[in-house]
């Protein structure tokens, strides 16, 4: 049996919407938001009414009767750490998101928009595999200093979706397989998936693991500490050095990997060094996750937008295919992943979880 499900993915400069009937897309639309449109809002929460109007306009434009919906799902935002799965949107979840209790991000609006429409229609609302999915084994939380623990913040939705898809293609269940999965995008996260659980992963948001097009990844601690007390930067500026203006931006002045790759192919030495270093760091992280799984790995999976780059993935494959086979699952279809999670619950194949 198939179900009509509306999927909502609010990003920092866009709102992506789609209605599915089972695994069939009835319609999909991405609405881009200009800096001018967003300039009047002081924070993400103030954008709620604006995004709500966008949602209603899109539904009306496609002539879809929302009364046909059987569920609404939003992208999960910054919440307390939870295990992977599909979660009912509750008042407690909404309260935490409204207060930005665990951080502020456009994805916080996903559950809020989903619940508003679902409540009007008296149907359930969900989120699926939010970025705060935390299934790390306890030994992986130990950082090296007792005052701070390692955190699990990564591209959980795409990691889990890629794992499920490849497991199915290999004729098995995600929950019965071991993968090392690398999400390659604006941020990069590399995780050890052991029988359906992400037992170790770099914190792709807060400065851990490989550098990416716009994030610094792990930095030499003492040098960064010196920068913190140099008086040259504010706390906000230092944070931007880690997330937003780190990685390729700091080396080459751009976060566009298309531009970087063009420079590499034109023989730009500086671009080649940075490009090779990023592939090297991703490969090294894959190797580390292979140790976490004690070498018992069914496949290495490369996913995310950068997995479309044959040049970039070839450099990773050269350095890691001695471990096991490397499978490329390019792109990230977050709307499809959100829908799949809800379809499984509505069909009774999986039980929803409560926040």
Curated annotation (Swiss-Prot):
It is found in: Cytoplasm. The keyword Cell inner membrane does not apply. One of its GO terms (cellular component) is cytoplasm. Signal peptide: none annotated. Its main location: cytoplasm. CDD domains: ASKHA_NBD_BK (cd24011). One of its GO terms (molecular function) is acetate kinase activity. Its EC number is 2.7.2.7. It comes from the Bacteria. This is Probable butyrate kinase. The gene is buk.
